[in-house]
Amino acid sequence: DAVKNANKLFMESGCDCIKLEGGSDVAPVIKAIVKAGIPVCAHIGLTPQSAAMMGGFKVQGKSLEAAQELLDSARAVEEAGAFMVVLEGIPKMLADVITQKINIPTMGIGAGAGCDMQVLVAQDMLGMNEWVPKFAKKFADLHKIIIDAYNEFAKESNERTFPDEATQYKDRKSVV
């Protein structure tokens, strides 16, 4: 089913790859999907779609045993054929070690600057919400801009200054 569903998603969506959350546990699935000719990006550490089962959005790989599991998972997804791996919500030192020990690129989100590349959620980076995760940086404050825009819209609507002449259709004299 995984290969069939991945193929359908890949063919019908126009995406460039399939991203699978999980490490050693999903390596056989990654291998099968890659064998079918579909590129796979793996995602280990804090995996958002299963965060509830991990006790919420918490840093992963803090104990020696958990760190070793993540390193083993990175190696397993690489061996299974993943072309890259997202490292999310793990200590910087662990992300550095994983990046050095595997031969596929790492993409970090809350994993320190040592990964091969970085990614952030647009809403966090653009400040679209009041709260942002510890690892994210607000590069803009769109939350304030959005709230101000809604308040201005409500004000002008209530005052009946919007819509105005420039933003409404003109009546034809023959119709009125």
Residue ranges of predicted features:
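Alpha/beta enzyme core
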Residues: D1-P133, K137-A140, K144-R172
